Amino acid sequence: MPDLPATPPDDESPDPRIGIPGSPFADRSGQPAQAVPAPRRRRPSRRIVLTAAMPAAAAVVGLTALTAPRPASLGAPAGDEELAAALAPHLGGHRRVAAILVEDGQSRLAGFGTGEGAALESSEFEIGSVSKTFTGALLAVAVERGELATETTVAEVLGAEAEGSAIADVILAELATHSSGLPRLASAAAGGGSILAGMLRKDPYRGRDAQQVIADALDETPSGRGEHAYSNLAVALEGQLLATAANTDYATLLTERILEPLGMTSTYAPVTVGNLRETARRGHGTSGLRQDMWTMDGSAPAGGIRSTPADMTRYLTAMIDGSAPGAAAATEVLFEESGASSTAMNWFLEDFGSGQPITWHNGRTGGYASFVGWDPSSGRGLALLSDTARSLDELAVGVLTGEVAL
């Protein structure tokens, strides 16, 4: 049967950090933490809405039970042979994968099922919620240019449009750190329709454009503001506010301020299906079934970017050495916890037990998984891209902490 939990573009847990070995979030069920400057927070409870979708779900199950996907088989290795050999034993359940390792400013690239040379470098992947880090970079650039501040409110960007909204005084820093009180998904878009889209292997965010996403957010009443509650809606709103303030759309802002300066010509936010390039391919759910491509419309700032190994090498290298536009997004902590974890502008900084914080974000759509992170103390960085929606987090953290030998 198809994958059920396709609503978030990261993973099924309320917070993408929960469940990663070594993470202080792995087993916690209510540890308090202090925000900067917000109050202490608790791990949010999982909310699952199934009732409205049950009749349709039963029909889908009946249809898909007749279809058996082929077992996953990791593709032929390509690129750096040593890197491929070290990673292959950890990639069970995956098919087409690209891995970028950066050490001492030098990069190594390996792939599976991608082909060699230019074919490997140009393979297109959905990067899911790693897209949030690009939105964080856009926020950092806007702050550097003096256009906005992390304390800028929703009302200051939207003006009269935000009048009377319960989130009018929410600030950009809260959106970028998942502490605004906004839910994971908009109430208008959540529930049975979203779950059914996942079961049908469709993009659950499709069909709600930028203005609808803004309107959805303005209609929400924050709950638990000042506490960490992972929210795709918050980051979607963040990106749309940045675009509104710059008098443009999100895809154009992304291209002009981040992608073009880095030479990332193969990276883009299609936003709608009509803007997908010929290089776009469908991925696989954890069941092995093909999934529709996710473009995410107005929610693209939270997970709708597509990229290639060559471009992600440029991005990772520039983030590590600080030369990327908006690189401060990864270092300016806006929400600090009492333990070994904090949040910058859409980046997580976390000590997984090695004694050194790792800067990272993961991503997951219906048919893809991704991870980008690095150890600032050593400069070692890793990006993993897969066309199967199976978590890469444990492998990635193992590489960055040295638990997985390369």
What positions do the PLM features span?
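Short, solvent-exposed coil/turn elements at secondary-structure transition points
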Residues: 115, 160, 272-273, 353, ...
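Hydrophobic (often cysteine-bearing) scaffold residues that line and stabilize catalytic clefts
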Residues: 79, 127, 131, 135, ...
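Short, surface-exposed loop or secondary-structure junction motifs
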Residues: 165-366
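Short active-site loop at a secondary-structure junction
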Residues: 95, 116-175, 221-231, 300-303, ...
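Catalytic loop of the DD-peptidase/beta-lactamase superfamily, centered on the K-T-G motif
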Residues: 2-111, 122, 243, 248, ...
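Aromatic/pi-system hotspot detector in well-structured domains
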Residues: 134, 235, 283, 374-376, ...
